[in-house]
From Swiss-Prot:
Zn(2+) binds at H124, H128, H134. Keywords: Cytoplasm, Endonuclease, Hydrolase, Metal-binding, Nuclease, Ribosome biogenesis, rRNA processing, Zinc. The keyword Cytoplasm applies. This is Endoribonuclease YbeY. PANTHER family: ENDORIBONUCLEASE YBEY, CHLOROPLASTIC. It comes from the Bacteria. GO terms for molecular function: metalloendopeptidase activity; RNA endonuclease activity; zinc ion binding. Binds 1 zinc ion. It is an enzyme of class 3 (hydrolase). Single strand-specific metallo-endoribonuclease involved in late-stage 70S ribosome quality control and in maturation of the 3' terminus of the 16S rRNA. Pfam families: YbeY. It is found in: Cytoplasm.
């Protein structure tokens, strides 16, 4: 399994070391989730609060900044058929957008490192791309447990 990550830091905040951590973490998450053999692709953007607020307003009807937004390309709506990638082309998972200011604020509020919070948000977004959600209490419990399991497997604990 191969995962291609198109990463754009619109804030010019992330270090090379942090970008490496992100790539390694996403590969770990893909292994943990046992993605089928093949090539996968996702885009990952790091933005300001203003940029994520605009996306949140335009696509979710919530005129406020948030920490992470995901747009799953493989999400199948009611009455829709799943789209299979053409042979030899990557399976496009979707887009993850993270607010760097919100990530920094939450890291301070929760008393852990910026990297830990960044990893949490990215894994959260990645799981949404794979179909996880937290609309019900049971879904939320399952999703948040998966997030913690992946972060622990990678060696990023809350402390």
């Amino acid at each position: 399994m191969n995962i291609q990550i198109d990463m754009i830091d619109h804030t010019d905040t992330l270090t090379e070391k942090q970008e490496t951590l992100i790539r390694e973490l996403l590969h770990e998450a893909a292994r943990y989730e046992k993605l089928a053999e093949g090539t996968y692709e996702l885009s990952l953007s790091f933005v300001s609060d203003e940029e994520i607020q605009e996306l949140n307003r335009d696509y979710r009807g919530k005129d406020q900044p948030t920490d992470v937004i995901s747009f799953a390309l493989n999400e199948v709506g009611e009455g829709e058929q799943p789209v299979e990638p053409e042979a030899g082309t990557p399976n496009l998972l979707g887009d993850i957008i993270v607010s760097i200011p919100r990530c920094q604020e939450q890291a301070e509020a929760y008393g852990h490192s910026f990297e830990r919070e960044l990893a949490f948000l990215i894994v959260h977004g990645f799981l949404h791309l794979l179909g996880y959600d937290h609309m019900s209490e049971d879904e939320e419990k399952k999703m948040f447990m998966r997030q913690e399991d992946i972060l622990t497997a990678y060696g990023l604990t809350r402390s």
